[in-house]
Curated annotation (Swiss-Prot):
Entry GO MF terms: proton-transporting ATP synthase activity, rotational mechanism; proton-transporting ATPase activity, rotational mechanism
Gene: atpF
Known partners and oligomeric status: F-type ATPases have 2 components, F(1) - the catalytic core - and F(0) - the membrane proton channel. F(1) has five subunits: alpha(3), beta(3), gamma(1), delta(1), epsilon(1). F(0) has three main subunits: a(1), b(2) and c(10-14). The alpha and beta chains form an alternating ring which encloses part of the gamma chain. F(1) is attached to F(0) by a central stalk formed by the gamma and epsilon chains, while a peripheral stalk is formed by the delta and b chains.
Ranges that cross the membrane: 7-29
Gene3D superfamilies: F1F0 ATP synthase subunit B, membrane domain (1.20.5.620)
Keyword list, A-Z: ATP synthesis, Cell inner membrane, Cell membrane, CF(0), Hydrogen ion transport, Ion transport, Membrane, Transmembrane, Transmembrane helix, Transport
Function description: F(1)F(0) ATP synthase produces ATP from ADP in the presence of a proton or sodium gradient. F-type ATPases consist of two structural domains, F(1) containing the extramembraneous catalytic core and F(0) containing the membrane proton channel, linked together by a central stalk and a peripheral stalk. During catalysis, ATP synthesis in the catalytic domain of F(1) is coupled via a rotary mechanism of the central stalk subunits to proton translocation.
Subcellular location: Cell inner membrane
Predominant location: membrane
Name this protein carries in UniProt: ATP synthase subunit b
């Protein structure tokens, strides 16, 4: 066996194997590697986008929370203001009712006082008439007149 012929045969076989591999085996391997490389790049990009979206969502959630707190504080302030207003209205209504009742009581007292005065006037008039009647029936003398007036004073 000739060593040169074997070496040439092996070289031709190796060249054929390299050509066959470059023509039929290498392109699918390169395509698979490119596809995998693209998938990895897409995954990393998606992870970056997801991270960015997560940051935006966290920021938006914080903004929404601040807005909700502000709205809640505003609602509470309005409720407190309305409660104070209701209390003031109730105080005013109570004061008006008290003033009205006081005025009614004063009017009632005034009416009762007027009735009492009128009654006293009638009694004084009756006593005066009775006294005058007694004076006219008796003799008119100073001592009797003074006694009758003292008696009338005592009765008044």
């Amino acid at each position: 066996m000739n060593f040169n012929a074997t070496l040439i045969g092996q070289s031709i076989t190796f060249i054929f194997f390299v050509w066959f591999s470059m023509k039929f085996v290498w392109p699918p391997i390169m395509n698979a590697l490119e596809t995998r490389k693209k998938q990895i790049a897409d995954g990393l990009a998606a992870a970056d986008r997801g991270k960015h979206e997560l940051e935006l969502a966290a920021k938006k959630a914080g903004d929404n929370m601040r807005d909700a707190k502000a709205q809640a504080a505003e609602v509470i302030a309005q409720a407190e203001k309305r409660a104070a207003q209701i209390v003031e209205e109730a105080k005013l209504a109570a004061k008006e009712e008290g003033d009205r009742q006081l005025a009614a009581a004063q009017a009632n007292i005034e009416q009762e006082a007027n009735r009492a005065r009128e009654g006293l006037r009638e009694q004084v008039a009756a006593l005066a008439v009775a006294g005058a009647e007694k004076i006219l029936r008796r003799e008119v003398n100073a001592q009797t007149h003074a006694d009758l007036l003292s008696q009338l004073k005592a009765e008044l």
